[in-house]
């Protein structure tokens, strides 16, 4: 992340002068510093600014910059004193054993079983607690399993000093003076995920900025050059990048990120809050399953954590001198985001959908399309064929329930291999609901541990989910993700009793799917249910296409059990939903670029958009450059 600090001076001075002129003496400002995309105001009387929030709101409206209030280090109590003060302010039954302090931000995050109960039991206002402790507080739901969050917080705590300097460097890079005030020029270079699924990556270039949108792997590619994004053809150095922005946590979109840090990238990574722990889990699992063949190390993953700046949805954020980013929920998986990129002084606006589901589901309410301006839309096409029409969601659920019941009634086993982020949680919730209603034959539901780990992160960030699920996470005695009907296992050995197994898909070594296939292969009345998209080259795709002989450790196994595909539950949009989404933006669009789909599906969707909606449409291959403006 190289830059010339000499170009920053006048711009920085203007920003700081405007802030100082706007602040009353009572604010007790001690310093102003860049904090990544934010401007941080440090005060030894932070309660004044927190109480008089209109002062900051007015400055934000004037400067068009994100401003945050920080407590000066001199007024912060020690962590032990702070916890003692907190405990004295709440009822005795409230447990504060999962409180994580972040010295870099002067914030403490309290994870608690009942956040509403803590709020109601606190004696005194939040402002008073900030005054007493010198720390700002965030409350979050305590998950059933906290180890992923604990690992993240441990890394952040250990690198607090490093992050303080990193945030300053990023801020100087973002708020540097522009090279030119001439109208923006912008282009996209396709590095992966075009006319193919996985290794999503593209480079957005302006005369001021270089921003990498997504950074994925294709673990099922046959050719080495098809596994990684083609950054080698961009002609730029790794530290010429201003930022990396991730749409979501799946390895197909985030799996290459630690490799960048391994080879020297030291810039920021932007994503939604839940994406940070989810991608950390995904990348760690990738190493664990790689048998020593991973392209990066756990240390590289930690470095990525340190350089990640999570963003709230719907907040406009400067990520370079001429690009502003806004993330909105794409409703694909927890934390998945569409990116709205505002280039220059309104010269051009790009929306990249990432992967999107444009309908309601048990986990999400369908995504918004309310963008003020969007000239270029980059839209996925996983199900871009005209024939890719899903049944109604409730009908799909009933078909799943009927399929499962038909097998369980014969005292047999149902195996459901699904991605462990997204559909695994939805199917678990569906089964929990229908068992409670007495509409599924009584049987054990076995869930692999990694799926439960992911579900725990859903509990922490339940505000990203549907209103109903969010309410249940906070208010029910038992979270819907901790159902009493689910049993956690790791590569379980099956007995003779009926069972439903929800196991992860898309792991590099195809485990634990192979483990269960070997046990089920000769049970002719057992069943494999395929409910998600199957990657080309994967074992799931081979089975879906009718292959019944597979190699296990050099031994050929014949799959004799039933294989059934259930349409309509996948976490993508079907053809009609994609067309509907594009049509909602039709009056604003100048161009649509279609990506993330097998080539025939990409071509079909692009042709349909052009023919039916009369919008200029492109479906580039990898290694193409497209001028936007």
Language-model segments: which ranges?
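RNA-contacting regions in translation and RNA-metabolism proteins
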Residues: 1-119, 125-157
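Hard-cation-handling environments
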Residues: 400-538, 550-551, 595
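Active-site neighborhood of phospho(di)ester-bond hydrolases with catalytic His/Asp-centered motifs
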Residues: 212-216, 241-257, 269-272, 327-331, ...
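Active-site-proximal loop/helix segments of hydrolase catalytic cores
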Residues: 331-336, 342-374, 380-390, 512-516, ...
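Metallo-beta-lactamase
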Residues: 162-183, 280-336, 463-496, 562
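Pre-active-site segment of Zn-dependent metallo-hydrolases
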Residues: 194-199, 203-267, 271-277, 282-308, ...
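Cap/insert and terminal regions of metallo-dependent hydrolase folds
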Residues: 359-447, 527-532, 550-612
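Core dinuclear metal-dependent hydrolase active-site scaffold
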Residues: 156-239, 310-365, 492-493, 512-515, ...
